[in-house]
Amino acid sequence: MINIALPKGRLVNKVYTLFEKIGYENKELLEDNRKLVFENKDKNVRYLIVKPSDVGIYVEKGVADIGIVGKDILLENNHDVYELLDLKFGKCRVCMASVNGYKEDIERRLRVATKYVNISKNYFNSINRDVEIIKLNGSIELAPILNLSDVIVDIVETGSTLRENNLTVIKEIIDYISARLIVNKVSYKFKNDLIKTIIKNIEEVL
């Protein structure tokens, strides 16, 4: 049995379709239900539907053999897994943004609101900028509007959410983020042939 962790939310159908194309289908997964575990014994596959930020943990701890996760989450959490394939969808960037017309005072500590604490720290350390990191878990765009922060660090796809809230990108911190296929290190050793076959088949349909 191969256990595959899929990210709950907007990408789950796209990711599942990828596995369906290579013969690991489970039609029940696309039905309107609240189940989080889907098993197809004929195909020897079990899908686990988990929060995107938790996919890496499930794979690192061996609960899942394979997972699909955004590169941003891998950079933020530094999970001890093998990153084996860029799936080339779910593309976005990690950017610093603020309200339109914002002018930075370089003499003052910069207040940064973000859910990407480690990515932000690494970036600002690299440019020797003194910052206060304010960790938020959602509605990051509100922070500079309400003066909770000077800037935000967040993922940007089209930029429409920023524009709708009168925010603009100041700096592109990471220019390419996409969905990645990750593998548990022990699984890669003991299920190597199966995992390599899955990767080869995925590469052929990308």
Curated annotation (Swiss-Prot):
Keyword entries, A-Z: Amino-acid biosynthesis, ATP-binding, Cytoplasm, Glycosyltransferase, Histidine biosynthesis, Nucleotide-binding, Transferase
Subcellular location: Cytoplasm
Gene Ontology biological-process entries: L-histidine biosynthetic process
Catalysed reactions, semicolon-separated: 1-(5-phospho-beta-D-ribosyl)-ATP + diphosphate = 5-phospho-alpha-D-ribose 1-diphosphate + ATP
Broadest EC class assigned to this enzyme: transferase
Enzyme Commission numbers on file: 2.4.2.17
Sample GO molecular function, one term: ATP binding
A Gene Ontology term for the protein's cellular component: cytoplasm
Pathway(s) per entry: Amino-acid biosynthesis; L-histidine biosynthesis; L-histidine from 5-phospho-alpha-D-ribose 1-diphosphate: step 1/9
First-listed, main subcellular location of the protein, grouped into a coarse class: cytoplasm
Pfam families per UniProt: HisG
PROSITE patterns, sorted: ATP_P_PHORIBOSYLTR
Superkingdom, natural source: Bacteria
PANTHER family reported for this sequence: ATP PHOSPHORIBOSYLTRANSFERASE, ATP PHOSPHORIBOSYLTRANSFERASE ATP-PRTASE
Known function: Catalyzes the condensation of ATP and 5-phosphoribose 1-diphosphate to form N'-(5'-phosphoribosyl)-ATP (PR-ATP). Has a crucial role in the pathway because the rate of histidine biosynthesis seems to be controlled primarily by regulation of HisG enzymatic activity.
Domain comment quoted from the record: Lacks the C-terminal regulatory region which is replaced by HisZ.
Subunit structure, as described in the record: Heteromultimer composed of HisG and HisZ subunits.
Family stated for the protein in its record: Belongs to the ATP phosphoribosyltransferase family. Short subfamily.
Protein name (Swiss-Prot/TrEMBL): ATP phosphoribosyltransferase
